[in-house]
Design a protein with these regions (language model features):
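Bacterial Sec-dependent N-terminal signal peptides
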Residues: 1-26
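Short loop/turn motifs that connect adjacent beta-strands in outer-membrane beta-barrel proteins
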Residues: 30-40, 68-76, 102-107, 154, ...
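Gram-negative/organellar outer-membrane beta-barrel architecture
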Residues: 35-43, 49-189, 271, 283-286, ...
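Structural signature of outer-membrane beta-barrel channels/translocons
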Residues: 49, 65-67, 98-102, 148-150, ...
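Transmembrane beta-strand segments of outer-membrane beta-barrel domains in Gram-negative
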Residues: 111-113, 118-250, 320, 324-332, ...
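Solvent-exposed, glycine/polar-rich loop segments of beta-barrel outer-membrane systems
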Residues: 177-181, 265-277, 333-345
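Outer-membrane beta-barrel "beta-signal"
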Residues: 194-195, 293, 346-348, 375-387
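C-terminal outer-membrane beta-barrel translocator/porin domains of Gram-negative envelope proteins
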Residues: 204-318
Length: 387
């Protein structure tokens, strides 16, 4: 697949209280549950992209941050909308909500997604080749709902629901897809019902400087609500250590597993995205299990340079980042150190909402170099941290 090059057309920071002179520096030393002024913010990020299979892609990433009450210790809530359309009549809409309420005792998340977008399918396992890619048209409907309640201290318990329907059709006859025997090759549907346990004592959920977050979700897809009876396990750990007033080291590990007698290829855990194993095309490697870990160093930077342009008045603050990771996809009978692949890169963050510690993130990452291919890499422009 031709690499998509994203170009930021413009940055519009339209937020209440964005004026830097009115904000306290809450980033360098913030204890758990830091009290900060509650301010709403809205950040739209228009982007343009081009690739031969999509043509010209026009879209935006918009994030609205707000608080559900005046409780000074309440975490901020967010609504994130990402719409995009292409000149090849393709469309995607992704809406995510992350709501905190009742003194952080209740936490609700949702994801509504529809896309009619092409993807590259490379095959199964961790030895796929770029030359074996087949371009597929993928139409997806997705509804994901999660609710968690504090049961004591820093512990939460909750329930989750995921419905997803996929349709696939090969756009070309080359590559590995036409001749592969795959479960639900043309698509299917699944409904996962799950239970979640969480430990969370982070000082802030957006740009964390100290604390730990551990999440385990076990979900079951019953046969009468899904095409196949399946089990899914998702576990993740995040731990942050402040090593100076301006610098932090974060550790992140995850494990995803899909179990059942017949496993649809499009539900298999995939390596690579803007959150973990940056530098790899999502789905370049996929298999029954996925295990990965990463370390990221962040250094807070305040150049103390005021900017006054028309109605924008700010004193921008940044963070520099360096990260490294290793991960592997594997089946139940075949895990070895040789499966693990590298990922490393550099990035910069801009705090567009200092009170809530919301950032715009730019990362460039490199992955492995397979024989006869260029080294895998990726450029990422995102709203929010990788972890």
């Amino acid at each position: 697949m031709q690499r998509i090059i994203f170009f930021t057309a413009t940055l519009l920071a339209l937020s209440q209280g964005l004026t830097a002179q009115q904000q306290k520096d809450t980033l360098q030393s913030a204890p758990a549950d830091t009290i900060v002024p509650h301010k709403r913010s809205f950040f739209p990020l228009p982007v343009l992209g081009y690739s031969p299979e999509k043509g010209l892609e026009i879209g935006a990433a918009m994030l609205y941050s707000f608080y559900t009450s005046k409780d000074p210790l309440l975490r901020n809530s967010t609504i994130n909308l990402i719409p995009a359309i292409t000149t090849e009549h393709q469309l995607k809409i992704d809406l995510k909500t992350d709501i905190w309420t009742d003194a952080n005792n209740w936490h609700f998340k949702s994801n509504l997604r529809y896309h009619d977008f092409p993807i590259n399918f490379y095959g199964l396992g961790d030895t796929t080749r770029k030359a074996g890619a087949t371009l597929l048209d993928n139409k997806r409907y997705k509804v994901q709902l999660e609710a968690e309640h504090r049961i004591g201290g820093h512990f939460y318990a909750g329930l989750s629901l995921l419905f997803q329907q996929d349709d696939y059709k090969a756009r070309e006859s080359k590559g590995v897809y036409p001749d592969m025997s795959l479960v639900d090759k043309d698509g299917g549907h699944v409904t996962f019902i799950g239970a979640t346990g969480i430990f969370d004592n982070r000082d802030n959920q957006n740009y964390t400087r100290s604390g730990t977050w551990v999440r385990l979700n076990i979900s079951y897809a019953p046969g009468f609500l899904s095409k196949h009876e399946l089990w899914k396990i998702d576990g993740q750990l995040r731990h942050f250590i402040p090593i100076s007033p301006k610098s932090t080291v974060g550790f992140n590990g995850l494990f995803n597993s899909l179990q059942g007698s017949r496993l649809p290829f499009y539900l298999l855990p995939e390596m690579g995205n803007d959150l973990m194993m940056r530098g790899y095309y999502t789905g370049r490697y996929r298999d029954q299990n996925y295990l990965a870990g990463q370390v990221e160093y962040r250094y807070f930077l305040n150049p103390k340079i005021p900017i006054n342009i028309w109605f924008v008045h700010m004193q921008p603050k940044f963070a520099l980042a360096a990260f490294g990771a290793s991960g592997a996809v594997f089946n139940n009978k075949n895990i070895a150190m040789s499966h693990f692949k590298p990922s490393y890169g550099l990035g910069v963050r801009w705090f567009y909402d200092e009170g809530a510690r919301l950032t715009m993130r730019i990362d460039y990452a490199w992955g492995e170099k397979r024989s006869g291919e260029q080294r895998q890499s990726g450029l990422y422009l995102s709203l929010a941290e990788a972890f």
